[in-house]
């Protein structure tokens, strides 16, 4: 029982579905402890960009530590939500948005200084743009696009690759980026498949009795 509670607290156990407070149509509830963590993460992004782009060659321990702290904040706001029970619709929207902003910020730095293969970075950016389009389409047709588990895991190898590339020139960073890219494309395929099934069900005429 204690082990099950620990898994749920750590975020490993996500059985039971998302909390009802995070669902579409619920109030945003901006003033919560988890959302405050997200606000700090967002506020640190321009600081990271200034430090990283002003580093000279992109390899700067201060920039790497900032990137790590912003990335780790994703775990912190989730833990805060589970400890306090302060779930919110805004938090459900803000968390993936902050993660995407962090990935794109890291991609800009790595592209500028050529720390990682640019073709892979370009694919990542193209994927994020595709997800923005899919999210907009989903909003228009009433589909609530939920993050799948592959998508949750995909972001970590990418962030690790960016973090490591800002510290040292190593093949490990490139390999981690490729792993994250493969998972990211897999997650994207799942999103589009879900969207296709939703549209099929939406356009299917209801049978009359």
Report each predicted region and the residues it spans.
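A feature for the membrane-embedded catalytic helix bundles of lipid/isoprenoid biosynthetic enzymes
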Residues: 2-50, 62-69, 97-209
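Juxtamembrane helix-boundary/capping and inter-helix hinge elements in multi-pass membrane proteins
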Residues: 85-89
């Amino acid at each position: 029982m204690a082990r099950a509670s620990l898994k749920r607290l750590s975020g490993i156990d996500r059985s039971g579905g998302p909390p009802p407070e995070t669902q579409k149509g619920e109030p945003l509830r901006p003033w919560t402890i988890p959302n405050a963590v997200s606000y700090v993460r967002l506020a640190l992004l321009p600081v990271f960009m200034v430090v990283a782009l002003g580093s000279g060659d992109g390899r700067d321990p201060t920039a790497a530590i900032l990137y790590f702290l912003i990335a780790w904040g994703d775990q912190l706001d989730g833990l805060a939500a589970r400890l306090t029970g302060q779930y919110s619709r805004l938090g459900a929207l803000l968390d993936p948005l902050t993660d995407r902003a962090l990935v794109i910020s890291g991609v800009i730095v790595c592209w500028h200084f050529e720390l990682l293969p640019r073709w892979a970075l370009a694919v990542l950016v193209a994927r994020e743009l595709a997800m923005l389009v899919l999210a907009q389409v989903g909003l228009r047709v009433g589909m609530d696009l939920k993050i799948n588990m592959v998508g949750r895991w995909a972001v970590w190898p990418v962030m690790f690759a960016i973090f490591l590339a800002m510290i040292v020139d190593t093949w490990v960073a490139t390999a981690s980026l490729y792993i994250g890219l493969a998972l990211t494309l897999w997650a994207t395929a799942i999103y589009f498949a879900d969207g296709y099934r939703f549209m099929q069900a939406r356009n299917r005429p209801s049978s009359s009795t």
